[in-house]
A protein has these predicted regions:
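A short, charged/proline- and glycine-enriched loop
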Residues: 1-2, 300
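Catalytic-loop motifs flanking and including active-site residues across diverse enzymes
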Residues: 22, 87, 128-131, 155, ...
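Short, histidine-centered active-site or binding-site loop motifs used for metal coordination
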Residues: 8-10, 41-43, 143-145, 202, ...
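Internal, conserved structured core segments that host functional sites
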Residues: 105-166, 170, 190
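Short, conserved loop/turn and helix-capping segments at secondary-structure boundaries
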Residues: 20, 52-55, 153-157, 211, ...
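Conserved nucleotide- and phosphate/pyrophosphate-binding catalytic cores
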Residues: 16, 160-334
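Short helix-capping/linker segments at secondary-structure and domain boundaries
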Residues: 97-102, 140-147, 251-259, 289
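N-terminal Rossmann-like or analogous alpha/beta NTP/dinucleotide-binding catalytic cores
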Residues: 2-136, 293
Length: 334
């Protein structure tokens, strides 16, 4: 069975864009691949954060992944497997400075910091080395495939280059060259501004919590923007298209087909579309919300199980590090 690695930063609650764009796919992949999924708290440290928030969000994200159907034995918390950081250092020595400065995400996040704090903004070296740690995350488990979106293709290509360079420098085809795993995932946009991707960084109006309050979910859908004002004649507006995308992502195809027929007949009522979308989300989310509450009621056991799964997964990372240290001329750890 082929190996799959994917990861998510613990930046707070999952929103429906996270679920439809990644987590739902993670759950499905477990049936066909040997999957390892990381809650990557080291990566979150590359941007300004509060220590207490990081710890709380790490566990919150872990519990929410479990509630969605990710198996506990497939989850690890990155900082509980410190071999990731050691491998990142070794791999950084076969990575060029120029490669890292060309990374689009580094440029974008550096600009974000400068926009917030001015030209004298502190941009940590961790942000520059983020892609090397990401390469370590992937290579340490000899992943064959990595589910990626378009925004991560550049980082995966760098991981492949780093693997190739390490293998060449140390004379052995040791690391696999991970391939992107493309699956059909809907692009869910902000309900408040459907010209932009759903994101927590834009503010509360711009995302819908996956496991949030039902009334709030319905209210956000009810107030979702439908008319963006600049839609070419004969084309569906971005806001209406976004609502249809959510309905399809919820697999409510009967409602989707019926409402789409109304749209093409010029008889679509936005209120009916929004009601169907809200109902579909609530139906999808309620079982996961119940799972989440059950997990929270047994916090200690759940946390212990994830520490155990992280320890088991760490054994694989330790084996990789033993072999990497030998290949790269470092003494064996007793």
């Amino acid at each position: 069975m082929k190996n799959v690695l994917s990861a998510i930063q613990p930046t707070g609650d999952l929103h429906i864009g996270n679920y439809f764009g990644a987590v739902q796919n993670w759950v499905r992949l477990q049936e066909s691949y040997n999957c390892v999924y990381g809650v990557v708290d080291y990566h979150t440290m590359t941007m300004p954060y509060k220590a207490s928030d990081l710890l709380e969000n790490t566990w919150k994200m872990t519990f929410q992944l479990l509630a969605c159907g990710v198996k506990p034995e497939n989850i690890f918390i990155q900082s509980l497997v410190p071999e990731h950081a050691e491998l990142a250092w070794i791999l950084s020595c076969v990575t060029s400075y120029g490669e890292l400065t060309r990374m689009t995400q580094f440029k974008d996040k550096s600009k974000q910091l400068e926009d917030n704090d001015g030209k004298e903004a502190f941009v940590g070296a961790g942000l520059l080395f983020y892609p090397v740690l990401q390469a370590a995350d992937i290579l340490i488990y000899h992943a064959d495939y990595v589910p990626v979106g378009k925004d991560q293709e550049q980082h995966l290509e760098l991981s492949r280059s780093i693997a190739q360079r390490f293998n060449f420098q140390f004379g052995k085809e040791y690391f696999r060259h991970p391939e992107p795993l493309y699956t059909e995932t809907p692009k869910i946009l902000s309900p408040a501004d459907p010209t932009r991707k759903m994101s927590k960084s834009l503010g509360e109006k711009h995302y819908i919590n996956l496991l949030g309050d039902e009334d709030r979910t319905r209210k956000q859908i009810k107030s979702a923007v439908t008319d963006t004002g600049d839609t070419p004649a004969g084309q569906m507006s971005a806001g209406v298209l976004n609502l249809f995308e959510i309905l399809r992502a919820c697999n409510q195809m009967d409602a989707y087909d019926s409402l789409m027929a109304d749209y093409h007949a010029g008889a679509l009522k936005y209120s009916a579309l929004k009601e169907s979308v809200a109902d579909a989300l609530v139906e999808l989310i309620n079982p996961m919300r119940e799972n989440y509450q059950a997990l929270l009621a047994d916090k200690r056991r759940v946390r212990d199980s994830i520490k155990d799964s992280s320890a088991v997964i760490r054994q694989r990372a330790q084996q990789t590090l033993r072999e990497v240290r030998e290949l790269s001329g470092l003494p064996a750890v007793k």
